[in-house]
């Protein structure tokens, strides 16, 4: 096998490969032998059919598999010889495999750009001191009390208000006919949490226990369920009860019930420690980003288009998920797909620059990520998302996501390695 390399750009290579006749014949013979082993034909014993008949019967399959085998073998050889790590799909361009002639084809792919890293040893960076405001701890304790509150009927016969829980029946109608999917009995509704349509909640807030009412139910044009988007219905409501939360005292008994703490002081200590841990991680991450932004301004390099496109896709997926959590859709933005791609592209380019810089730093620092670490990361993702580990790992493998996960882990390790070499000065937090 012979090959020549063309640099189509600083981030794209093309390799022209020529496979000699001898290798072509060997690949075809191997493919024929595989098919011949299990082939049966009248007049011949199984596995004894002449090669020319096997080739004639399964020509398309044999030549296809021989081509694939040759390409796979030579791609691995070329990548090893060039010490190349493609970051894009490898595009194949070649003719048909034929007996008696060399097999010539080309492959093209994108690679990381080559550039000199700036000197980050002793790089000056300021990191804010991690502090915890006791008001934040008090807010956590209040949330715990709220979650453990007892719901008791209000003393007076009044409509519900923000913070109350209303028990009600409701049903929606269109032209006097019930609308399937919009009705419930003894439904518990938290007022003030903005989870219901404004029309619905406003109506409920006018009704005391035992009262009934009806009013318009207007769905926004960007409502996530297209069956109701932009529709105007009528909703009928009957309130059974209005309840208020009776918060338990912030005492040792609450601490024991909430988390098995021996006292309220111990629970406050645990909350404070948790806050301090997350705040320490936050101020470090903020300082690391500031340092990285400064280092990125000291270098310039071209960006592989495939990598930018990948991050554009990720950002659009994130946008779609956020909108869906708000009960909206991408269409609600009123923009064409190409407009949305153009909007997120600058951010995608910045993410790409950051990732490339850190991958180069990882190579310089000798940072590696092994298979056990990747498996551990997938296990963490599975636990956080409530998914099955094996199913999630299969998904990552089938969708070629393992390598991008590995690169993210490499980038994180590289950032830590760079930061360890920085001259970090702790400063007081900025006034809020």
From Swiss-Prot:
Transmembrane ranges, per UniProt, are none
Q: Where is the signal peptide?
A: none
Name the source's superkingdom.
Answer: Bacteria
Primary site of residence: cytoplasm
The EC number of this protein is 5.2.1.8
Q: Under the GO molecular function aspect, what terms does this record hold? A: peptidyl-prolyl cis-trans isomerase activity; protein folding chaperone; ribosome binding
Q: Which reaction does it catalyse?
A: [protein]-peptidylproline (omega=180) = [protein]-peptidylproline (omega=0)
- Keywords for this protein: Cell cycle, Cell division, Chaperone, Cytoplasm, Isomerase, Rotamase
InterPro entries registered for this protein in UniProt: PPIase_dom_sf, Trig_fac, Trigger_fac_C, Trigger_fac_C_sf, Trigger_fac_ribosome-bd_bac, Trigger_fac_ribosome-bd_sf, Trigger_fact/SurA_dom_sf
A GO biological-process term: cell division
Q: What is this protein called?
A: Trigger factor
User: Briefly, what is this protein's role?
Assistant: Involved in protein export. Acts as a chaperone by maintaining the newly synthesized protein in an open conformation. Functions as a peptidyl-prolyl cis-trans isomerase.
Its annotated compartments are:
Cytoplasm
What is the similarity comment for this entry?
Belongs to the FKBP-type PPIase family. Tig subfamily.
Q: What cellular-component terms does GO give this entry? A: cytoplasm
Q: Which residues form each disulfide bond in the chain? A: none
